[in-house]
Amino acid sequence: MLIIDKRKGEKMPEYEVIPTPSVGLNRALGGGLYSGMTHLLWGTPSSGKTTMCYHIIAEAQRRGFRPVIIDSEYSYKDKYAEQCGMDVSDPVIVQGTIIEDILKAITPLLEDQNEKHIYLIDSMSNLMKDEFYAKPDGGKALGLAARSQGYFLQKLVNYLHKERNIMLFVSHQMVDLSGMYPILRGKYGNTVHHNMHNIIKLFLSMSQAEMERDKAKMITSQKVMWSIEKTKQRASIGTSGHYYVLPQEGGIDTLRELIDIAVEMEIIERRGAWFYYGEEKWNGAGNINLSDVQHGEISSKVLVG
């Protein structure tokens, strides 16, 4: 528990801002994801949820945060994490699905008063209490999965500190049939929703026109749509945009997204197939080649605008 007496001159804890690899998402969130908060990324398969988190972790490492990765899918690989820019000699990797065991393993890290940590739970959907595995019937009590998630989240949120911790959660999508029409939601719905400061939905476009393939027909670039479903950072609920994930490289095409936003904001002027910025002009969006100075100027205008 944190008590701040303003009469005594005590100040609120300061947060740090960890940028995401998406220019548009940073713009909507006020620079990136804030420390001392919980952030949920959910959406369609292969929409780059884990890739996005690895890039955020890489940025956090440059700011002195140590990664703690709870890998309930047993999918973590050093090679891919390194492709995303992470220092793979630094993280603590916890692989498992039983909530009690995971909490026991990471509690010393949560209670650490000196080191800053960034936690990644990938994914929420696989975590269960020991009751599920211990009982012969699988602990099929009504709402066990939802209670398990709520128990786990409340334990973690208790250790949040604005200066020291930031938590990323990945969840799969589910179809909610409780209303008149089916809707897509993050798995475990309200239980997860109430404990999150930011909820970001990622949706992979399956349009062939928005995919790029190499000569062997392997997909080299795909467009991913994002939307902010909940945020405690700034008034940007409902804001949406897109970025491009590069599945073969383990990357996100920041430059291409920046150009798209600059064209939408008319920072780069488009006339037919020609694009103009200052005295420079290019024929076709794929031929736009920004210098370092131009890249910096456009980035500043996009983030401020």
Regions found by a protein language model. Name each.
Residues 96-165:
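Phosphate-binding/switch loop-helix module in NTP-utilizing enzymes
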Residues 253-283:
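Long, well-ordered amphipathic alpha-helical subdomains in the mid-to-C-terminal portions
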Residues 76, 127-128, 177:
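Catalytic P-loop NTPase motifs of RecA-like helicase/translocase cores
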Residues 273-305:
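Terminal-proximal interaction/regulatory segments of ATP-powered molecular machines
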Residues 62-64, 84-91, 135-144, 185-189:
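A short alpha->loop->secondary-structure connector
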Residues 72-74, 96-97, 124, 173-174, ...:
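Short, ordered loop/turn segments at secondary-structure junctions
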Residues 1-91, 107-111:
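The Walker A/P-loop phosphate-binding site
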Residues 142-265:
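Phosphate-binding/switch region of NTP-binding enzymes
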